[in-house]
């Protein structure tokens, strides 16, 4: 046996021991979950996690290995929280629309074992997560062709109790769906979500097809299927066609071949780590104040990947701002940046922490 085989054999032996220890650990996690159920305690305990990570770092003698072990322990705690959520019946994820909607597809990719719960509007998804009716919410945030989903950003601003804990980029292929046997020249009206209509505007204009906006693409497909009217068509996914018994008459009608929608994941639990973080802030309506904030961010060494502005609710002609920054949200530099922004901005809030 050469050196490589010996090393791999040692890894296999250690992995066998780790598997038994993992089962032992998860049995203890089950006891913790049952105690939390009996005493009405939340799954996430920030103070406990901080203490566990500090003890974990102290166990490792090698400074080079210490951060890797801390990441390993953090992953173990994340798995434990997921297991506790299942045990406590909190394995529910909310989305807007009906089965087959792009949000439902994104949810299934993110949480394949979760109980998917549908709500009619984005507002109700936010409310469900905030109330604790769902542990997570999956909503669209922006599209590479049609731009921001402004209403969702406004909901983030208006729900300070919620965090963005993950993002997911879903490649979007918009398709013209019809009743079986329908020809293109029979179609008189098209139904879909406003974003899908915007993403398919070149095709619609080419064939002179008027479009009507609906709550989402899957609802449009369901409407066309239930109408039984061959003059109606929907713009939606291939998965939706199969779900509602429709045919794909024209595939990939979106103008942008690289059409992608970014979804965000909402949670009541504060995220612990990642390589991106996002902020919401407001500034005094004075010359140069926004520029001052941008200069502070730049001077702190953070790359700004996105900046957006939106009108402030009930405050005419004033705006709040959203920025996404590249960096470790737990680093000392991030804490220093937030302190500096707190002194400069009228308000500032850490909205999200995630890996991208």
Where does each model-flagged region fall?
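Domain-level signature for soluble enzymes in the chorismate/prephenate branch of the shikimate pathway
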Residues: 1-356
